[in-house]
Amino acid sequence: MLFRSTPSHGYLDAVDRHPWLGVCFDTCHAWAAGHDLASPGGMTATLDALVATCGPGRLALVHANDSKDPLGSTRDRHDNIGTGRIGAAAFGELFAHPALAGVPVVVETPSEGATGHAKDIATLRDLAATPVATG
């Protein structure tokens, strides 16, 4: 079973009391809740905090999406990767984080007509393949 927090609800610390729960990290939810993923090192710090709070190996799924709204807005309005307020560089940090090893990523962005999510998937693949200096 996966647990996904929503903006403005800080209950991920409960996961450590339930060993059968995993965590779904939603980038737009984290942004909406006030985690500054866009600043250099921001995604890394947020994922470090998630691992420290929930425990290693608990991250089981990522919902990847940029945000149309300002940091801390508590609004969950998805944007295409690299075109919103989070920005492409944060997703490069996401893929460089060791907690992401083997974790599936689901694209949750606005569909772009007949091509669907192809552009966002290609962008994420490029970012995942590009080395990022961390920490």
Where are the model-predicted features located?
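Acidic/histidine-rich catalytic cores of soluble enzymes
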Residues: 3-81
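A short, acidic, flexible beta-alpha connecting loop/helix-capping segment that sits on the rim
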Residues: 106-115
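A short, acidic, amphipathic alpha-helical segment used as a generic capping/interface helix at domain edges
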Residues: 44-53, 85-99
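Active-site loop/helix belt of alpha/beta enzymes
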Residues: 84-86, 121-122
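C-terminal helical cap(s) of enzyme catalytic domains, especially alpha/beta-barrels
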Residues: 114-133
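Secondary-structure boundary/capping positions in well-ordered alpha/beta enzyme cores
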Residues: 18-19, 57, 101-103, 131
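A structural signal for well-ordered alpha-helical scaffolds and beta->alpha junctions
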Residues: 5, 43, 87-88, 117
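S-adenosyl-L-methionine
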Residues: 95-104, 125-130
